[in-house]
Structure formats: structure tokens, C-alpha cells
Amino acid sequence: MGNFILHPIQSRLIVISYSILILILPLYALFSYASNASWSLILEKATDPIAVAAYTLTIKMALYTAIINTIFGFIIAWVLTRYNFSGKRIMDAIVDLPLALPTSVAGLALSTVFGRNGLFGHILDFYNYEIIYTKRGILLAMIFVSFPFSVRAIQPILKEINKEEEEAAWSLGSGPLETFKRFIFPIILPAILNGFTLTFSRSLSEFGSIVMVAGNLPLQDLVSSVLISQYLEQYDYIGACVISIIVLMLACSVLLFVQIIHSLVVVDSK
């Protein structure tokens, strides 16, 4: 069987066509449908107090999640890369578990553990501390579903670090902290930013687990994805499209900001 080689023009055509079909066309349809409404209606839907509260809560929880998972993701990646211990392979496999679980199953699992009658819920209830059906439940759900991204972004870079160069830094009198600060951290910083971006994006789009662990009450713990679902259930397609576009624009703004920082970091490291 001969080698299957595509002409460069054919390759570009396939890539462009696939991108248009999967990415551009759905977004165009979203903007096109929203454009059928009057500007006054779009403004009314976009600035509705319930919608504004949902944007704010969603962005805030996604940022908190990205910060938390980036910190702990680095720690876990460091342990999995630098240490050998029994059960290491099992722990490494467990990291990817949230990617395999349906989000509704994740929500049910979290409710079973942290609900009022759950494994830890009754202990938390004794201290009048609730997680499920509160904003804490949203944060917990986002942390769970986006947990693997920072670990998997940082782990390969840590594996590629030249141990001989690291040992050379130690031999020159640099302590472990100084070696990490001057040698290791600049190398892994782009990966940390990538992990942060992936975690933030995944958290922003979460729906299945949040709808099960949050109270989904307007102006309290209602996130944008659930609000969009509620609009669709009410056959308010214009409202759903407007909210979707606003969330998309907010997400793109944050991601653009992170990418600018990433570019500056890469330039400085060269």
C-alpha cells in the first residue's frame, strides 16, 4: 500500500472546512439568531439583574477554581514526577477520572459525599456548614471536573527538565529554593499558564454537575450555563443566545489576557 500523502492545498482545505463546520458555523448561527432581535431586547436580556449576577458568579467561581487547581495541580504533578512510591500508577490514573465520568455522575457523587445526609455532610451539618446547594457546591463541582487539566499541562514539562543541569545548579551553591526559583520555575511557567487557561475554560462551561449540587436560585447561586438552560426550557431562545454570547465574550477576554501574559513570559524566557 503506497504512502497516503495529501497535497498541501488539500490539507489546508480539509483543516479549514473542518474548522468552519465544527467551530465557525455554530458560532455564526448563535450570533445570527441573536441578531434577529431588536437592540432594545438584546440590551434588556444582557443587562437583566439575574443575568448580570450569573455572569459575575460564573467568572468568579471559574477564576477561584483555576487558581486552586493550578496550585494543587502543580503539587500533584511534582509528586508524580519527582517521587517513586507504591500506588503511584494508580494515583496517576485517578487524576484522569473526572474526564471519564459523565458530569451528572460527578454531581451525584459529590452530593452523596457532601450532602446533608452524605458521608461528610452530616459532620459539616453539625457545624452548620453547608456545601451542597450553595456557592461552595459550585466551586467544588468546578474543581472536580477541571482537576486533571493543570496536572497534565505541567507534568510533561517537569519530566523534560534536565536533571544534570539542575544538579549543576546545586553544585554551584544554589539551594533547592533558589534552584527552583531561577531554573525550574521559568521553564514550567508557560505550562502553568496553559493549565490555568484550560482549567478556567472547563470550569466556565460546566453544567451537568453544577445543576445537581447548586440551589440554582436567581441572584444567589445561579451560574450562566444553568441560566441558559432555564431560558431554553422557557422557549426563550433569544435570551439563551444573548447570555451565551455575553459569556463567550467574557471568556475570550480572560483567555486573551492570559495568552498575552503567556506570550510575554515566553519572550522573556528566550
Swiss-Prot record:
The protein's name in its UniProt record: Probable sulfate transport system permease protein cysT
Record's GO cellular component terms: plasma membrane; plastid membrane
NCBIfam families reported in the protein's UniProt record: 3a0106s02, permease_CysT
Subcellular location: Plastid membrane
Organism lineage string: Eukaryota, Viridiplantae, Chlorophyta, core chlorophytes, Trebouxiophyceae
Signal sequence extent: none
Entries under Gene3D superfamilies matching the protein: MetI-like (1.10.3720.10)
Keyword Transmembrane helix: yes
Organism in which the protein naturally occurs: Helicosporidium sp. subsp. Simulium jonesii
Topology of this chain in the membrane: Multi-pass membrane protein
Membrane-spanning ranges: 13-33, 61-81, 94-114, 138-158, 180-200, 208-228, 238-258
InterPro entries: CysT_permease, MetI-like, MetI-like_sf, Sulph_transpt2
Record key words, sorted: Membrane, Plastid, Sulfate transport, Transmembrane, Transmembrane helix, Transport
